[in-house]
Amino acid sequence: MIDRGSEVRILREESYWFNEVGTVATVDQSGIRYPAVVRFEKVNYSGTNTNNFALSELVEVSSPKKKDK
């Protein structure tokens, strides 16, 4: 299950970050086409380090780390 804090690999071939790993910042539950906002370490040509992706374009590499309370 892709959730906030998950490390994901990008499968969208036309993306600058294709096959790169990023961290999910948020996942929108309202039913929009590209609900997952993914943040990356490196920036693209326009200086952006975030992008929206569909859940079908992402593969979870590692799940979010649980906080100890």
Swiss-Prot record:
Gene Ontology terms: biological process: photosynthesis
A Gene Ontology term for the protein's cellular component: chloroplast thylakoid membrane
Pfam families, per database record: PSI_PsaE
UniProt entry keywords in alphabetical sequence: Chloroplast, Membrane, Photosynthesis, Photosystem I, Plastid, Thylakoid
Keyword Chloroplast: yes
Lipid bilayer topology: Peripheral membrane protein
Record flagged with keyword Acetylation: no
InterPro entries registered for this protein in UniProt: Elect_transpt_acc-like_dom_sf, PSI_PsaE
Record localization: Plastid, Chloroplast thylakoid membrane
Gene3D superfamilies: 2.30.30.50
Function: Stabilizes the interaction between PsaC and the PSI core, assists the docking of the ferredoxin to PSI and interacts with ferredoxin-NADP oxidoreductase.
Family recorded in the similarity comment: Belongs to the PsaE family.
NCBIfam families: PRK02749.1 (NF002745)
Name recorded for this polypeptide: Photosystem I reaction center subunit IV
Encoding gene per record: psaE
